[in-house]
Each structure stands twice: as C-alpha cells, then as structure tokens.
Amino acid sequence: MAAVTRYSGKVVVVTGGSRGIGAAIVRAFVDSGAQVVFCDKDEAGGRALEQELSGTVFIPGDVTQERDLQTLVSETLSRFGHLDCVVNNAGYHPPAQLPEETSAQGFRQLLEVNLLGTYTLIKLALPHLRKSRGNIINISSLVGAIGQSQALTYVATKGAVTAMTKALALDESRHGVRVNCISPGNIWTPLWEELAASTSDPRATILEGTLAQPLGRMGQPAEVAAAAVFLASEATFCTGLELLVTGGAELGYGRKASKSSLGEVPTLPPNVH
C-alpha cells in the first residue's frame, strides 16, 4: 500500500512519454498514486498507453513547438488545477557521427529537442510549480559528464541539460522548487535497439554496451523511472543533484586509446622497457 500512495494526489507532466524510459516514468508515477499528463509525437503509442493506464492523460505534442508545450501546461491545469512535478524526458540520440560528419543544422535541430524543449517547458511550468513548491526532473545522460566517441553534438546537449539543472536549482531554491536530473547510462530501450540496428554489427554493438557496466547488464527503463519517483517524493532535501543510473559504467580505469591514435608503438613512461 505504501508504494501506491507515495505520490498520491500529485499531478505530474512527462514529455516523451509514449515509449522507453518515458513510458516507464509515466507508469511508475501512476503506480505511486499520481495523475500523469504526458506528451509525445507518437500519437498511436501515446493513445495506447493512455488506454492501458487509468490516471493518465495523453496530449499529442512536439517539444520543439512552444505552442504544443503551452497546450500541455494549460490542459494539465484545466483538468487538475495544479502542477507538482515536471519530468523533461523527451530527447534523441543520433547515430554515430565523426565530428567532420556533423553539421550546424543538425546540431541546431538536436538542441531544439534535447535542450530548448526542456528550457521552454520549464519556463512555462515554473509559475505553477512555485505555487505548489513542486519539483523538476530533467533526464540527462552519463555521457554529458564523461563524453562519448562519435557523439559530439549529443554529448554537448546533455552536458548542457545537467548544467542548466544545477543553475536552475540555485535560482529556484528561494521558491521552494527542487530541480534535479537523472543521468542514465546504457538502458535497454527502443532507441538503443534502433541505434544498434544502424551499426554494421548490431549484436556486437549490443554486447559492447552490455559489457560497459560492471554489473554486466544494461539497465531497464523501470529502474530509471524508480529514480524519478524517488526524486519527486522522498528526496525532499535534494536539489541540484545529478543522479547516475548507470550500473557503474563510469567507474574504474580502462583502455581508452586505439592503435590509430597511438601509432605503431605506444609512448611509454621513461625507464619502462
């Protein structure tokens, strides 16, 4: 019974809620007693989840369109009268690209989804979150802190999400609004599966992603969702926090250089033969 009531009576908005981590977050908040309003460009997926889960409202929307986000907030307030938590989950990871293969146009488009959509919804929701002394949870990424090869633009957007979280936490503390972010590592989602399928050897890509964690597996969307419910409910003394849900992928030393970057012979320290 405690799990059902831990966020009872609260109203939560989730972006990108139709599948993967977003759908798991919607489900977890409903299981915790909240009313959840979620948006996604995938209308069919959103309608299906809305039909499956009582306590949810789906509103089709694109986070790059401010009008859609205005509708998301206004519909939430019209139906429920208040807003307690915003989860900025919508985001995209492009296929692997070398730096010279990226473009300014592609970077701008990614910024619109991964960063500016988050910023815009925060601005629209803040007056209402201040009234409820609510909280914001931004979904960032481990690679925003540690980097990732062939993901220059994605890493930049997620690093910015984490930095924005910390800056906003300082500004909003005086209003009693907590602002935190979750940085997942390798989580087995439809997007991860699609990215693997775009490589020359999907099975090898999946194996590499699996072995990146000391725990020896990828995470599940429900594990990220559990972290989100914790931040919204029990974590009342946490703000500006980046919560890593990574299976320990960032831990330890490991091989970083490739033969192409070393040349034929590695450069060893003096007196090493």
UniProtKB/Swiss-Prot annotation:
Q: What does this protein do?
A: Catalyzes the NAD(+)-dependent oxidation of L-fucose, yielding L-fucono-1,5-lactone, which rapidly converts spontaneously to L-fucone-1,4-lactone. Can also act on D-arabinose and L-galactose, with lower catalytic efficiency. Does not use NADPH. May be the initial enzyme of the putative L-fucose degradation pathway in mammals.
EC number(s) reported in the record: 1.1.1.122
The Gene Ontology biological process annotation of the record reads: L-fucose catabolic process
Catalytic activity reads: L-fucose + NAD(+) = L-fucono-1,5-lactone + NADH + H(+); D-arabinose + NAD(+) = D-arabinono-1,5-lactone + NADH + H(+); L-galactose + NAD(+) = L-galactono-1,5-lactone + NADH + H(+)
Similarity comment text for this entry: Belongs to the short-chain dehydrogenases/reductases (SDR) family.
Which PROSITE patterns did the record assign? ADH_SHORT
Give the record's pathway. Carbohydrate degradation; L-fucose degradation
The record's active-site residues are: 154
Its annotated compartments are: Cytoplasm
On subunit structure and binding partners, the annotation says:
Homotetramer.
Q: Where does NAD(+) bind?
A: 19, 21, 40-41, 62-63, 89, 154, 158, 187, 189, 191
**UniProt xrefs under PANTHER family:** 17-BETA-HYDROXYSTEROID DEHYDROGENASE 14-RELATED (PTHR43658:SF8), SHORT-CHAIN DEHYDROGENASE/REDUCTASE (PTHR43658)
Alphabetized UniProt keyword annotations: Carbohydrate metabolism, Cytoplasm, Fucose metabolism, Lipid metabolism, NAD, Oxidoreductase, Steroid metabolism
InterPro entries, A to Z: NAD(P)-bd_dom_sf, Sc_DH/Rdtase_CS, SDR_fam
GO cellular component term, pick one = cytosol
Give the protein's recorded name. L-fucose dehydrogenase
- List the GO molecular function terms: D-threo-aldose 1-dehydrogenase activity; identical protein binding
Protein origin, superkingdom: Eukaryota
Name the gene: Hsd17b14
